[in-house]
Swiss-Prot record:
NCBIfam families named among the record's database cross-references: hypA, PRK00564.1
Keyword annotations of the record: Metal-binding, Nickel, Zinc
HAMAP family per the UniProt record, alphabetical: HypA_HybF
Pfam families per record: HypA
InterPro entries: HypA/HybF, Multihaem_cyt_sf
GO molecular function annotations of the record: nickel cation binding; zinc ion binding
Protein name according to UniProt: Hydrogenase maturation factor HypA
Binding-site positions, Ni(2+): H2
GO biological process: protein maturation; protein modification process
Residues noted as binding Zn(2+) in the record, renumbered to the chain: C73, C76, C89, C92
Length: 118
């Protein structure tokens, strides 16, 4: 499961942002997950719940926004938004398409707090 390595990198990125902002607690992590990212949302959530236990994200809620696949057809010039992993143009059924969005997983926002250490 590559979701474990993805979550490990995500938590590391969260920790870097928290340190840069002098926060010692992250309460929410918002990500955008593309349909073609190759990441399974349920497995990602399970991995996050497992890995967050040791560290600054231990109380964090993971919020995922699923980004549909956006393609441009190079034959009929139609732009389409798809919710399935397909690069076929729904208008003309051409495979001659270009992916515009929906391939990535992005950290969109963090909700952080500064707590007293006493």
């Amino acid at each position: 499961m590559h979701e474990y390595s993805i979550v490990s990198a995500l938590i590391e990125q969260c920790e870097q942002h928290a340190k840069a902002n002098r926060a010692n607690k992250i309460t929410r992590v918002d990500i955008k997950l593309g349909v073609m990212s190759g990441v399974e949302p349920a497995l990602l959530e399970t991995a996050f719940e497992t890995f967050k236990l040791d560290g600054i994200c231990r109380d964090a809620e993971l919020r995922m926004t699923l980004q549909p696949l956006v393609i441009a057809c190079l034959d009929c010039h139609q732009e389409s938004e798809l919710t399935e992993r397909s690069i076929v143009c729904p208008a003309c059924h051409s495979y001659h398409t270009r992916v515009l969005d929906g391939e990535d997983m992005l950290l969109m926002q963090l909700e952080m707090e500064q707590e007293d250490e006493h």
